[in-house]
Amino acid sequence: PMGRTNHGELIDPPRPVESLRLQTAAGDWFDWQSVQDMWSMTLVSEGGCDAACIEILILVRQLRRATAANRQRIARLLILMPDANGRLELPNLGGLEGTQLLIADSSQRGGVESLFPLQLSEQAIPIFLIDPRGDLMMKHDTTKNSSKEILQDLEKLLKASENWAQGGRYGHQ
């Protein structure tokens, strides 16, 4: 086996996300099939998306742009869940068009917390990667990983996956 060269933390085993029932800002149920065959750079936030969260969303947008021709293979997701008091403030994503805002209601909070390794009390807002199969597979700590390191991981994953079958589950059921 080749030596590990990734900068992010691998989530092993990968965790399927399709069981999460999330709503779009318009109130429709989010269809995970809409991001099938794409890498999803995902943020999870509680209560809303403050200035630090918006900064990371801007970083995600810049990282996606930096992948040039591959940018069409990357989705940007922001999963919001209510805070401990049940409050949820929808952020203004002006300038961040293309970021899909997904809302986990209080009944889905446990599902989000069990899937995504979160330390909500910490200042760091991690960037999670969901692979084209719909499995959560990597986490980047934005206080430890530089944007260059995150981009290197992203480019490696895009290159490694460019020949994956489109529309299939790659031999997995």
Please provide the spans of the model-predicted regions.
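Structural microenvironment flanking redox-active thiols in thiol-disulfide oxidoreductases
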Residues: A51, E55-L96
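Short, internal strand/loop/helix patches
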Residues: L77, D83-A84, L88-I125, I130
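Extracytoplasmic
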Residues: Q36-M38, R71-R73, E122-A124
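Thiol-/selenol-based redox modules, centered on thioredoxin-like
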Residues: Q123-Q173
